[in-house]
Amino acid sequence: MFLIENSLIHNLINRQTGISKCLINLQKLILEFAQKKLNLRIVNYYMTPINFPYQQNPDFPNRYISPEKLFFFLQKNYSECISELGTSSLGKPIYKMTLGKGDIKVIAWSQMHGNESNATHAMLDLLAIFKGHPELYEDLFSKISLNFIFMLNPDGSEKWMRRNALDIDMNRDFLKRSSKELKLLLNLIENGNYDYALNLHEQRTIFTTDGKNPATLSFLAPSENFERDLTETRKKTMAVITKMYDRLKNILPNQIARYTDEFYPTSSGDNMTKMGIPTILFEGGHFINDYKRTGTRKFYTIALYEALKAISELNGSTENWENYQNIPQNKETHYDLIYRNVKLNTDFDCILDVAVQYREEILEGDDEISFTPIVVEVGDVSSKKGWEEIDCKGKKFISEKKFPKLDEEVNFKIE
């Protein structure tokens, strides 16, 4: 019997990430033919992201998602598998979608922070993909049962705010349970006997994997205590993340990181891990020249699928958990924009750097977020880099004020 590596077959028939359903089926036929007719044994066959048939849900092209638009879409297209979990502080519905009949029970939620929409997009994109590729759905959801909470914080999501309508950060409210929305989630979790949880978030543009490449995706196996003990629950989480990383690193090289695992005693993921539920934290981050996060959205969607796939395969195993530590850790190295060598209009010689971050907001009547440049640091910023840098040497600083003010909009020009 001859032996052939599955990766060789992938290389023969896969040359792009946007492979179609017909090519996926062709791959399966080639593999079956190799096994049955040519007496070849295929090693390590699985569906890799290389041939994942990604497509964006056409109903949600913008980064901003209106709660009302989401609710209407779910009610119109998925009424048979959604139920109202409860309502928000301002009375907006919060929907739970139930998919699959497998034995492995998974709970996931999106937009606990209202200004983090990538996870909602990822689930909406997966629904569109499953519609066109039912074989992916059937394979996955024969093994797992998923409860997905869409837009846990609809009040904050409507205003594009991190916090809820009462200005509570739900991800720091586990012990007090002051927020109505978090109580709904925790009641479901505490009575649901879940095997895994997916805590889906986004991170700022400041993070990289190596000081150069953006941390487009970061994952975390949260700690249970200040000592960061490697408990069995954490090892199960690490095993899932390791398997995800192994499958994603080739399509997103040098842009996947490991989030810091310091213990946060009031946060959701840390306490759910403490409860014995392996909880995978997702953080969608920056993608070069992509502040609308369209690229991040694509890889977030694939990562969500790969997380569910890994869970279905591991089923509580801690296999290869130790390789989690090989994933590069997030580094805080960048600003959105840095003006270098700015000479101010002062009575004395003053040359400095000005660092800028974009503030995201949804303006009344708009259906997409806007970006406002805000001064976040002034002085020597030589230890940091900018995704965009402007050298102002030999140029004029033009402003009504003599110097830029921290935490205010950029109100100057460089000419």
Spans of model-derived segments:
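Aromatic (phenylalanine/tyrosine) cluster motif
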Residues: 2, 33, 45-46
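Short glycine- and acidic-rich boundary segments immediately preceding or forming the N-terminal edge
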Residues: 44-94
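C-terminal accessory segments enriched in acidic
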Residues: 41-64, 192, 220-415
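Short beta-strand-to-loop junctions in surface cap/lid or active-site-entrance loops
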Residues: 96-103
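Active-site/substrate-binding loop(s) of hydrolase catalytic cores
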Residues: 103-107, 112, 117-254
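Short hydrophobic targeting helices and cationic amphipathic motifs
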Residues: 3, 7, 12, 23-26, ...
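Conserved beta-strand scaffold positions in the cores of enzyme catalytic domains, especially
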Residues: 82, 96, 148, 197, ...
